[in-house]
From Swiss-Prot:
Family: Belongs to the chitin synthase family. Class I subfamily.
Keyword Cell membrane: yes
Protein name: Chitin synthase 1
GO terms for cellular component: cell septum; plasma membrane
Membrane-protein topology: Multi-pass membrane protein
Catalytic activity: [(1->4)-N-acetyl-beta-D-glucosaminyl](n) + UDP-N-acetyl-alpha-D-glucosamine = [(1->4)-N-acetyl-beta-D-glucosaminyl](n+1) + UDP + H(+)
Cysteine-cysteine disulfides: none
Pfam family, one: Chitin_synth_1
Keywords from the UniProt entry: Cell membrane, Cell wall biogenesis/degradation, Glycosyltransferase, Membrane, Transferase, Transmembrane
Gene name of this polypeptide: chs1
Record has Membrane as a keyword: yes
GO MF assignments: chitin synthase activity
GO biological process: cell wall organization; chitin biosynthetic process
Free-text function comment from the UniProt entry: Polymerizes chitin, a structural polymer of the cell wall and septum, by transferring the sugar moiety of UDP-GlcNAc to the non-reducing end of the growing chitin polymer.
């Protein structure tokens, strides 16, 4: 839940930033209407119960309604959709849901079986991509926290160069206050 919340908090901050771009032809106060946050979870039995609780708190998941079969046929995935006005804050690895002004459109795909990351990417592009027909897509793993305007800058790279097929951002280690995370060998390397 902490990794998921860290990522979603960063995504929400980026949407808020795009909504403050008053002089933009593309963005501005209704920018949130042009952005859909898609979350794909790999396996109903595998999803962390606390992450499920965060999704339920955001309004995009309902516990107990997913079924393995419908009319005798196996279910592949469960799709939930909601426009939330609930925010996420994270302090000392404690996730808190907070009221927020900026709406965020959410699509949540809970795959019935764990079929690994590439299958999740396929779901994202083949299922949601065909329906949403986005100008750009940004893929983030849970735990990756985008800076408050980094998604905007990725979008800007595509906007300035329409023939650009891909771009990536810079990844920085989260050092923590006073660099305390550097004591952790996983962060320090």
């Amino acid at each position: 839940d902490v990794l998921f919340a860290r990522t979603m908090h960063g995504v929400f901050k980026n949407i808020e930033f795009m909504c403050t771009r008053k002089d933009s032809k593309t963005w501005g106060k209704d920018a949130w209407k042009k952005i859909v946050v898609c979350v794909v979870s790999d396996g109903r039995a595998k999803i962390n119960p606390r992450t499920r609780a965060v999704l339920a708190g955001l309004g995009v998941y309902q516990d107990g309604i997913a079924k393995q079969q419908v009319n005798g046929k196996d279910v592949t995935a469960h799709i939930y959709e909601y426009t939330t006005q609930v925010g996420i804050s994270l302090k000392k690895d404690i996730v808190t849901l907070t009221p927020k002004q900026q709406p965020v459109q959410l699509l949540f795909c809970l795959k019935e079986k764990n079929q690994k990351k590439i299958n999740s990417h396929r779901w994202f592009f083949q299922a949601f991509g065909r329906v949403l027909d986005p100008n750009i897509c940004v893929l983030l793993d849970a735990g990756t926290k985008p800076g408050k305007d980094s998604i905007y800058h990725l979008w800007k790279a595509f906007d300035l160069e329409p023939h650009c097929a891909g771009a990536c951002g810079e990844i920085k280690a989260m050092l923590g206050p006073g660099g305390k995370n550097l004591v952790n060998p996983l962060v320090a390397t």
